Amino acid sequence: RKNNLSIICYDLSNLSEYAKVSNAAFKLMKKHLPGPFTFILPTSSELPKIYKNRKEVGIRVPDNNITRTLVQSLGNPILTMSIRDEDEVIEYTTDPELIHEKYEHQVDIVIDGGFGGLEASTVIDCTTDNFEIVRQGKGEL
């Protein structure tokens, strides 16, 4: 999927500002978030310019206290992007020091919250009435 940018929210309270969400999708999200999931939804017209030509947006409410506290303190969701590489899982995608070494000239800040998990999040496409697991990861439905 081309949609490699996601929005990290503190909770689901302002979800309709970023995505169009059906009742069934909202219930599924409410049951499993915060957690290791990315839900792909149709975009709302209120999204930032970076999403202007996109029809879908990934929504995340991770079960990570550092991330959620950062979002809550900012008062707004943040955009996130997964580290992509040809390798499946490599050490520098989970080690904060190695992430900093590799990306220090491409990112403004790396927050050291310890080593990350090696298992990716579960991605669920909720753009139609028939939800589809795009990638099975750590999250179980």
What is the role of each PLM region?
Residues 1-141:
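Active-site-adjacent structural elements in enzyme catalytic cores
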